[in-house]
């Protein structure tokens, strides 16, 4: 069984949206690595507590943690908060059997009725399904694996209905070599409805939130991140990027 934790950065709006991009990221691991990697994250958080004073129960929500930490976390200087983010990325990059699937929607030029949320999630679910089918995830593998979704809370109802629909009707355009038209490639490897998680209670959701944030900052860095070269932090995750997710991008980013 492979588990995929999911979070996003940016917003889904098209009209009058303050953001150009919407990023959706999935962090995938095999069930046999779950406890090992949870222990790795706990060790990281204990080290951060000793070094910077960030308590284990404090949520590390990357965007807010860096720019709007609130009264409790504001006691940690901003440059230290950035260092924590960098060290978090470096810790994830050591987890060789993690795999990161990244979807980027460039909303510029899209029609007002373009379904950013639905199409981004459809692309992520399809890549998860495909990679399961081809046994392309690193780490332990059984002959016939399945997968489950563990997203941060989002439009829970819409996502649940989308996944259920894709199990019965999932039109995918034919590759150019096979001519025009579609094939109905229904989802068969992903079981159950999405299991939604509260990021404040899940280190894995906080980890995938960090990845989505760093990819967004790689695309359009804030003034502070640009000043500190933080736009390059996403590249520190290169060892665990799922590069088979897209042959059109050297880092496997699926661009819509």
Where do the protein language model's features map onto the residues?
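Phosphate-ester processing/binding pockets and catalytic centers
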Residues: 1-256
């Amino acid at each position: 069984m492979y588990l995929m934790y999911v979070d996003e950065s940016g917003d889904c709006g098209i009209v009058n949206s303050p953001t150009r991009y919407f990023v959706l990221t999935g962090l995938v691991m095999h069930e046999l690595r779950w406890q090992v990697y949870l222990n790795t994250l706990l060790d990281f958080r204990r080290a951060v507590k000793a070094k910077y004073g960030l308590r284990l129960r404090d949520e590390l929500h990357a965007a807010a943690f860096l720019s709007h930490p609130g009264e409790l976390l504001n006691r940690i200087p901003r440059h230290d908060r950035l260092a924590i983010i960098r060290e978090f990325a470096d810790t994830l990059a050591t987890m060789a059997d993690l795999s990161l699937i990244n979807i980027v929607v460039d909303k510029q030029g899209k029609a007002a009725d373009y379904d950013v949320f639905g199409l981004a999630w459809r692309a992520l679910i399809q890549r998860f399904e495909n990679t399961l089918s081809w046994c392309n995830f690193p780490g332990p593998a059984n002959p016939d694996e399945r997968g489950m979704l563990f997203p941060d809370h989002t439009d829970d109802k819409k996502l649940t209905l989308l996944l259920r629909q894709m199990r019965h009707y999932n039109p995918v355009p034919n590759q150019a070599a096979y001519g025009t038209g579609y094939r109905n490639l229904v989802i068969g490897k992903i079981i159950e409805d999405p299991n939604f998680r509260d990021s404040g209670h899940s280190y894995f959701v906080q980890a995938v939130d960090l990845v989505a944030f760093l990819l967004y900052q790689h695309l359009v860095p804030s003034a502070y991140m640009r000043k500190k070269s933080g736009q390059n932090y996403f590249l520190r995750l290169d060892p665990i990027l799922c590069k088979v997710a897209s042959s059109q991008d050297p880092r496997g980013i699926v661009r819509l």
